[in-house]
Structures are given as C-alpha cells and as structure tokens.
C-alpha cells in the first residue's frame, strides 16, 4: 500500500509462493502487476528499482544478495539475517553493487519517537545517562507467523524475532556506540498457550554499556500473557522521559509531576498500525537525492550485532565485547 500511495513509485511485480496470495492483494488494493513464484526469474525479467524483502528471515541472505546483484535498492524486513555469516553475505553484496538500503525499523517514524528525538535534541532532560526500552508481545498461534517463528531456524532468538525493535529504539535515542553486552534468557514452556513451545528462549533481558558511560536495558518477551506494551524510560541529568510523559527541570522548573504529551504511541503489535508509509517515502527520497538512510544496512549492523552478542552472552554466561560484526 505504501508504494501505491507514493506518487513516485508503482508496483511492477510480486514474487510469492502461492499466486492466489498475490491475486488477493491486487484485488483488495486495486492494482495489477506481474506475479512470479520464482524470485530469480522476477529479478531477471521485471524492470525493478526497489525490492522489498518480506520473506521469512532464513531466506533473507539468498534473496537480498540476488536483489543487490541485480542492481536493486533494498527495503529489508528485520531481522536482516539470523546470524553473523548471513549478515556479512548481504553486506558484501550491497557494498559491491553500491545500492541503497533501508531496514524496517519502522518505529523510527512513529510520532512519539520523533517527539522524543526533538526533546533529546533540545536537551530537555540534560545529559542522558540511562535508558531502557522493552518489548512485551505474546506471539502465539493466534498469529500466522507463530508456526515458523517458534522455530530456532526461523525465529532465531527473542531479540531477532521481535525485540530488536526495542533494541534499535534504545540505540536511536542514546546515539552512542554500544561497547559491551550481557544477557539472560528463559523459557516458561507455557505449552497450553504456546503449543509446541518455542525452540529458543522467548524471554530475554539484555544490559548494555555504551561509550561515555551511558548504560541501558532491553527486555524482550514474546511469551508474555498481557496486552502489547513498548515501555520507554530515558533518564538524564535534568529530567526523565517516560513514554509520552516528560519531567524536565530545564524546561519547566516549577513542574511538580510528569506532563503528558498527546501523540501516537507505539502501543500495538499490529503491523497496520506501523508507519510504513513514512519509511517508504523516506527511502524513495533518499534514492532520488542520492543520500543514505539513517536506517541503512550500516546502521542496522550495530543493532544486529547486539542481538548476536546477547544470544552468545546468554548461552555462555559472560559479557561480550563489541564489535563482533
């Protein structure tokens, strides 16, 4: 839908496993295009400038490398790859082809995120020294993706499956390089609610050390029994941001409690709630202006290496120094 709404783009082709899926999309959205069941054939035959890769994560390296080698710019769903090797394969292909990329850390375009960035830029809470962002979203059989997301070979880890949205948010707010990671993980084995169970620990807490002494925490829980939440806390030398609430001794010295900012929060796990239109509009403009996206593959490597390091830390019970990617 985002491509249809952008006046500079049109959908030229879709590659799917089942043609009827593409036909249903075309009918519901009112457009027509070529339909393929073979990605390589589509890349060879169709006249494409941008390829959006929304396949299961284990397929990303194969599809992203092929699209980059075909000279296409990439919109790549997260996780980019489930391991360091897969990420490096994609990065090498992108570097060689000199194509542009945007990774779908789509919450960077959420209005609350934009508001928080403006507040941090204005030093509303002074110098940031602590931040935490959590991801709480029970992903069970009521979501179609559960059948593959629960598998180690496809979901990867709690962070790679979904929690990296929170991890990327923390990085986006802190704006400093992470230097060390320590993580713990667990699995409730709630087989009544999550039949078959997760093959990896769906609950993980990750503690991070950034340059210049900033520390942070990310909890990722995709087996929780509660409504979706994405809590944010950022503490600085002059105040605190707590979701859409601000306490700022600098801006409001007479303040006696948190002030609430009316805005759109990241309070739904439903992808229709996410600002994909802003992401696609941003990427099209990046291509037209020949500039890199702030959410490109280079930046995404810094979020993904924390995920890989957290998984290693939880498995071996030790801190992991960065970089590893």
Model-derived features with residue positions:
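N-terminal Rossmann-like dinucleotide-binding module
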Residues: 1-30
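Active-site loop of classical SDR/Rossmann-like NAD(P)-dependent oxidoreductases
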Residues: 17, 225, 268-280
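Beta-loop-alpha module in the N-terminal Rossmann-like domain of NAD(P)-dependent dehydrogenases
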Residues: 31-93
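Hydrophobic residues in well-ordered beta-strands that form the structural core
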Residues: 76-77, 82, 101-103, 218, ...
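Rossmann-fold dehydrogenase core element
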Residues: 89-106, 126-131
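Predominantly a Rossmann-like dinucleotide-binding segment in NAD(P)-dependent oxidoreductases
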Residues: 107-197, 317
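Contiguous beta-strand/loop segments that form the cofactor/metal-binding neighborhood of enzyme cores
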Residues: 167-250, 277-290
């Amino acid at each position: 839908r985002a491509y249809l709404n952008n006046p500079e783009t049109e959908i030229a082709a879709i590659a799917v496993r089942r043609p009827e899926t593409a036909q249903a999309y075309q009918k519901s959205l009112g457009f027509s295009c070529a339909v393929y069941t073979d990605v390589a054939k589509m890349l060879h035959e169709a006249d494409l400038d941008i390829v959006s890769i929304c396949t299961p994560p284990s397929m990303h390296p194969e599809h992203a490398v092929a699209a980059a080698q075909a000279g296409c710019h990439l919109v790549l769903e997260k996780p980019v790859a489930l391991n360091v090797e897969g990420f490096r394969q994609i990065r090498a292909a992108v570097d060689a082809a000199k194509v542009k990329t945007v990774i779908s850390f789509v919450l960077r375009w959420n209005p609350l995120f934009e508001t928080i960035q403006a507040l941090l830029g204005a030093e509303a809470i002074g110098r940031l020294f602590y931040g935490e962002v959590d991801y709480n979203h029970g992903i069970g059989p009521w979501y179609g993706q559960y059948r593959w997301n629960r598998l180690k070979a496809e979901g990867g880890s709690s962070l790679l499956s979904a929690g990296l949205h929170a991890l990327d948010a923390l990085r986006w707010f802190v704006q400093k390089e992470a230097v060390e990671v320590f993580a713990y993980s667990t699995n409730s084995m709630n087989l009544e609610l999550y039949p078959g169970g997760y093959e990896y620990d769906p609950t993980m807490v990750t503690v991070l050390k950034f340059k210049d002494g900033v520390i942070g925490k990310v909890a990722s829980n995709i087996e929780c029994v509660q409504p979706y939440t994405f809590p944010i806390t950022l503490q600085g030398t002059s105040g605190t941001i707590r979701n859409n609430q601000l306490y700022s001794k600098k801006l409001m010295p007479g303040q006696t409690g948190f002030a609430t900012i009316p805005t759109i929060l990241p309070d739904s796990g439903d992808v229709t709630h996410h600002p994909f239109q802003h992401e696609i509009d941003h990427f099209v403009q990046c291509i037209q202006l020949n500039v890199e996206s702030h959410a490109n593959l280079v930046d995404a490597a810094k979020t993904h290496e924390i995920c890989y390091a957290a998984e290693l830390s939880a498995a071996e019970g030790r801190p992991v120094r960065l970089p590893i990617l």
